[in-house]
Amino acid sequence: MGRPRTSQTRGQGPSGATGGNPRGGGSTTRERDARGARPGERDGGSEIQDRVVQIRRVAKVKKGGRRLNFSALVVVGDGQGRVGVGLGKANTVPAAIAKGQEKARHAMFDVPMRNTTIPHEVVGEYESSRVLLKPASEGTGVIAGGGVRAVLELAGIKDVLTKALGSTTPVNLVRATEDGLRQLRTKAQIEQIRGVKVRL
């Protein structure tokens, strides 16, 4: 009898992080849910999931010649109102993803919600990109694409309308979405700031 063979998922590094397509796009391999999110660590009883939005290959010209590095844009969230975005850079794809995950976890913040949607309309901005986020009725779903969808879904938002304005660079759109979510306030918070009753 021969020795049993063990297999390793292609693109997976020794740390368990998976490699992506160096030309960009979504993440690849390892156990994921139906929408491509990957189970991760637990934070206060909630499971943190992550999604690799983009992997880019960057060439630096030095005295010894060209040196290749990779950058990975990663979104993490618990699906219950907390989300974070991180950009990791390293000389290998798995290392870049791991750094992106770590930065995203440290950058997690709370997202105010009203049932399954956001409490009010908001426009997030980052450099030349803007993302309009509008509340939607239950059952609408997340009307968004690419990185914008990843941020909203991992935050736990199930019904929302979005529109991308300006630059459609993945990094800019993700950061603009993050900015929009950071601007959200609950009804109680708005009333406290304004000192008057409001209707949302």
Curated annotation (Swiss-Prot):
Q: Which residues form the S5 DRBM domain?
A: 48-111
Residue ranges for the region (Disordered) are: 1-49
**InterPro entries, from UniProt?**
Ribosomal_Su5_D2-typ_SF, Ribosomal_uS5, Ribosomal_uS5_bac-type, Ribosomal_uS5_C, Ribosomal_uS5_N, Ribsml_uS5_D2-typ_fold_subgr
GO: which molecular function terms?
A: rRNA binding; structural constituent of ribosome
Q: Which GO terms describe its biological process?
A: translation
Compositional bias ranges of the Gly residues kind: 13-27
Pfam name, any one:
Ribosomal_S5_C
Q: What is one term from the GO cellular component aspect held by the record?
A: small ribosomal subunit
Instruction: Specify whether Lyase is a keyword of the entry.
Output: no
Supply the PROSITE patterns for this chain: S5_DSRBD (PS50881)
Ranges annotated as biased composition (Basic and acidic residues) = 29-49
Q: Composition bias, kind Polar residues: at what positions?
A: 1-12
Keyword list (alphabetical) reads: Ribonucleoprotein, Ribosomal protein, RNA-binding, rRNA-binding
The entry describes its oligomerization and partners as: Part of the 30S ribosomal subunit. Contacts proteins S4 and S8.
Domain notes for this protein = The N-terminal domain interacts with the head of the 30S subunit; the C-terminal domain interacts with the body and contacts protein S4. The interaction surface between S4 and S5 is involved in control of translational fidelity.
Q: Per its database record, what is this protein's job?
A: With S4 and S12 plays an important role in translational accuracy.
PANTHER family, A to Z: MITOCHONDRIAL RIBOSOMAL PROTEIN S5 (PTHR48277:SF1)
- Which NCBIfam families does the record associate with it? rpsE_bact
UniProt similarity note: Belongs to the universal ribosomal protein uS5 family.
Q: What is this protein called?
A: Small ribosomal subunit protein uS5
Recorded name of the encoding gene: rpsE
